[in-house]
């Protein structure tokens, strides 16, 4: 079914760093009918993945030709409200949810197949089965799907760069400056809700300790204490980006 669907979208939610998963998705995303939306907290990085989720979706508008026919999702809950809305509106013909939980959450109101297994094993097996498949056998309609998203990604980048160049001093500008100076060995913790959303507006380095956020049910609790606990067991730099209310709340 993966090879037959003209438009495939993979969505990665909250997930711990896993080089095997990133490597498998790197291979899978070589297929030109496949695009990967990887939120910052997914800790997934590939050459073509889209991590600046909200700004790319904003630049995409309401073009229905971008709707996926096959959606494959894994990881925890998404940060991006825009991505949730986009996928609920898209109504993909099939949605495979890779989730060890039972029953699996139907976040996008489109779940057709619950694959009750761990994401790491699934993606390694999936990439292995596709190893001998050649992209040229895909339907002509699907050839440009990934390319369409990459063009929008580039457009969104240029719009963002122009906006930030003219932006005055603000929390958004401060966030941009901070991201430029975070050491590579860092584990980055972002508090709810503004910091973790800002994180997905900027391209930034892949930090050795991963990117994390305590996504509590009531919003702002736990970010500071989570980062403090993490720093006790992590040998590198632990950095928390938070706001005054969130810091005081904890």
Residue spans of the language-model regions?
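Conformationally flexible catalytic loops at phosphate/diphosphate-handling active centers
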Residues: 1-4
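Structural motif
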Residues: 7-9, 70, 187, 237-239
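Glycine-rich, anion-gripping cofactor-binding loops and their flanking helix/strand elements
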Residues: 12-96, 104, 206-236, 248-250
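Phosphate- and divalent-cation-binding pockets in alpha/beta enzyme and binding domains
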Residues: 19-20, 81-82, 106, 125, ...
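Active-site diphosphate/adenylate-binding microenvironment
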Residues: 150-236
């Amino acid at each position: 079914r993966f090879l037959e669907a003209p438009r495939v979208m993979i969505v990665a939610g909250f997930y711990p760093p896993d080089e095997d998963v990133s490597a498998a998705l790197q291979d899978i995303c070589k297929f030109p009918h496949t695009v990967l939306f990887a939120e910052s907290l997914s800790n997934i990085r590939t050459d073509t993945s889209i991590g600046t989720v909200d700004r790319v979706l904003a630049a995409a508008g309401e073009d229905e030709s971008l709707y996926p026919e096959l959606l494959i999702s894994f990881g925890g809950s998404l940060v991006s409200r825009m991505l949730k809305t986009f996928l609920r509106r898209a109504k993909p013909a099939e949605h495979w949810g890779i989730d060890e939980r039972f029953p699996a959450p139907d976040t996008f109101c489109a779940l057709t197949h619950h694959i009750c297994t761990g994401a790491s094993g699934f993606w390694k097996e999936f990439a292995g089965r596709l190893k001998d498949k050649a992209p040229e056998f895909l339907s002509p309609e699907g050839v440009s799907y990934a390319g369409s998203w990459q063009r929008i990604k580039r457009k969104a980048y240029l719009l963002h760069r122009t906006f930030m160049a003219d932006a005055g001093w603000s929390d958004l500008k401060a966030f941009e400056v901070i991201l430029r100076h975070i050491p590579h060995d860092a584990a980055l913790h972002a508090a709810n809700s503004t910091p973790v959303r800002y994180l997905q507006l900027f391209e930034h380095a892949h930090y050795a300790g991963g990117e994390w956020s305590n996504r509590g049910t009531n919003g702002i609790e736990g970010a500071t204490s989570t980062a403090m606990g993490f720093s006790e067991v992590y040998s590198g730099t632990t950095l928390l980006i938070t706001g005054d209310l969130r810091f005081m709340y904890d």
